[in-house]
Amino acid sequence: MQSLNLPNAITLARIALVPVVVLTMLDARRGGSPALPAALVVVAALSDALAGYLARRTDEVTEFGRIVDPIADKALITGALTVLAVQNRVAVWVAVAIVGRELAVTALRSVAGRRGITVSVSRLGKNKTTLQVVAIVTLILAPDPYAWWVLILVYAALALTLVSGAEYFAGLRSRPGGEAGPPERSSSPGG
């Protein structure tokens, strides 16, 4: 299997989209439309699903894709949350907690990978990413980012983020014989 196939090209395009998302988010707070960065976040999320689907459907799941796809997810989430925190559209502590979890799981995967252990993506991890994207799009578009319904969504995303992070660490500690990961295993990108 070659590394630069269509699913991996889509993932690389998603990474290239991150600075565009950040710049359009910054512009939206200076009078630009928040619809554009919100739409770009949705496009990035849908491209993630498309890349994973194509990789599995065409049997083009590569080691490159397994490594780079979660990095693309984390770059998007981190970039968007950083801008939202700077713009005071989300509490800094919430952004730090979510980004901190993302970095911790990335570090866990890196250390485990060097030891020959695969940390697979769980269904909870995929759901976490989806809820994060919904929360980010809502924070971009909401006239009042501190409205009760927005806060419920943000705190739900935070809770799922922390629970899924704990699941990865617990899964690594409980797996004998070099296999690690959460209870539900998946070969698809994300997490």
Regions found by a protein language model. Give the residues of each.
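Membrane-helix boundary/interface segments in integral membrane proteins
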Residues: 101-117
